[in-house]
């Protein structure tokens, strides 16, 4: 079911580190005049360890509280959390729909070697992300299935 592009819209940008989430989210933010939520940016601005899962969870909860308020006002919100699990994506989709928002999923993927190269080139992570850590993340990441993708109003799969 295609919903109006003029009403509230939630855009979920999904993928592993180095997949291009921030690049896409910033492009969409500018083009759509959307509000973008990135926990990494907030944690960096607060000089917090981006690997502190407890604080990340609190920041994401706060971002989602603001996001829902903005959706209720009819705005476009971009969630740039990675959303590694289907249950997290389902929760966001269902809550946004309850507010009358259309929901988009943009899944970005790339081979591990490409992800690792991008992560090393940007050099933002402290401590560094090592290849074995990235391989563990690849194992736990739940790739959106065709059945899940069909639940969204609009979707895209972008890869290298």
Where is each model-derived feature located?
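Glycine-rich phosphate-binding loop used to anchor ATP phosphates in small-molecule kinases
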Residues: 54-104
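NTP-dependent small-molecule kinase module
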Residues: 1-6, 31, 139-160
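Conserved nucleotide-binding/hydrolysis micro-motifs of P-loop NTPases
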Residues: 41-43, 84, 109-114, 157-159
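A glycine- and Lys/Arg-enriched "phosphate-lid" helix/loop adjacent to the NTP-binding pocket
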Residues: 97-144
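Conserved substrate/cofactor phosphate-moiety recognition/catalytic segment
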Residues: 19-75, 117
């Amino acid at each position: 079911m295609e919903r109006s592009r003029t009403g509230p819209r939630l855009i979920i940008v999904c993928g592993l580190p180095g997949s291009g989430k921030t690049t896409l989210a910033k492009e969409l933010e500018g083009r759509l005049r959307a509000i973008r939520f990135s926990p990494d940016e907030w944690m960096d601005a607060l000089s917090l360890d981006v690997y502190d899962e407890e604080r990340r969870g609190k920041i994401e909860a706060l971002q989602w509280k603001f996001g829902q308020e903005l959706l209720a006002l009819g705005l476009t919100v971009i969630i740039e959390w990675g959303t590694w699990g289907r249950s997290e994506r389902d929760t966001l989709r269902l809550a946004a729909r309850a507010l009358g928002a259309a929901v988009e999923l943009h899944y970005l993927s790339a081979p591990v070697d490409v992800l690792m190269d991008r992560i090393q080139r940007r050099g933002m992570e402290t401590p560094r992300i090592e290849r074995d850590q990235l391989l563990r993340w690849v194992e736990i990441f739940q790739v959106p299935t065709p059945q899940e993708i069909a639940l969204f109003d609009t979707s895209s799969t972008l890869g290298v």
